[in-house]
Amino acid sequence: MSSLTIGLTGANGFVGSHIAESCLKEEFQLTCLLRKTSDTTFIRDLIYTRVTGDINDENALSRFVRNQNIIIHNAGLTKAKNESEYMEVNANGTKNILNAILQFNPKIRRFILISSQAAVGPTSSSEPLDESIPKRPITAYGRSKARAEEICQEYSNKIPITIIRPPAIFGPREKDIYEYFRIINKGIQPVIGQENTFSVVSIQNLVKGILISIHKQNKNLECYFITDEGDYTWDQFSSMIADQLNKKPIKIKIPNWIVIIMVGINEVYSKIFKKAVLLNKEKLKEMKQTRWVVTSQKATKELGYRPVLTTKQAIAITVDWYKENGWL
């Protein structure tokens, strides 16, 4: 068994469960910070040490960070009722963990933050975004992730920190892009707004990038985009999904006014029932952008990152998992 000890937040979710599995395959000793109410279905068969609490619980954090060589901070909100909720969890939660590290494990080898392309915003030119581009987030979620990165910068003279920025992530267990798989499986390909181009990363490639970053000996702060090779339009991405599903979906153009009405209904629902929704004004801002394209050249050069799967291969694996688990 490896002597490397890993502390992981958000281990029960889509991304976190895959990180947890891969850490155990590497024979790392894994400790997971989980809320008392966390649904642990995805990690129920894994062997790990559980610390019960959350990223606002100082006592739990003190127990969680002790004796860890690496902390991978993956927990966070991707949907929230308002910006303050995003900030409280995504930004302040990051600060809480870093404070706990300074107090209880100041000689930690590395803190790895799983951030997002949303922290930087869409592409403003024909060239893909790289790590030198200034952050221009356009959503509350993006601003909260950008703030988390800024907090990391503030602590980087005391703690070695790596920031991983994925674009849109897909793969087994993912529940948002999954809805697109589900609709295409019904023979429909919705076309919303103008055509846009974007980067994606399969969960397998993302986890590969995270694992190799564990051994990167940067002294201060490094940031890396991790992505699949190439970029796609929604039509191209949809075609790959349809091919794996053996479907020839009918393309249905959804007028902007219908989308705006749907967003309005969702916003009212969210306010009345105090629940976060996926399709809201923030998501509409993202959908209106024409390019969400990044490059992982820095990760390739400095980390030796190479995708382990093509996007097409990863879509095939994802479709198989959705079918095997009754999602399709």
Regions found by a protein language model. Name each.
Residues 162-179:
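Flexible, glycine-rich beta-alpha linker
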Residues 4-26:
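N-terminal Rossmann NAD(P)H-binding glycine-rich loop of SDR-like oxidoreductase domains
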Residues 39, 44, 48-92, 120-121:
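NAD(P)H-binding glycine-rich loop region in Rossmannoid oxidoreductase-like domains
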Residues 9, 192-196, 224-231, 242-245, ...:
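Glycine-rich Rossmann NAD(P)(H)-binding loop
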Residues 216-279, 296, 312, 316-319, ...:
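Mid/C-terminal beta-alpha module of Rossmann-like enzyme folds, strongest
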Residues 136-162:
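Active-site Tyr-X1-5-Lys
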Residues 147, 174-179, 192-214, 221-225:
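Substrate-positioning beta->alpha
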Residues 96-140, 162:
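Conserved Rossmann-fold NAD(P)-dependent oxidoreductase catalytic core, especially the SDR/UDP-sugar
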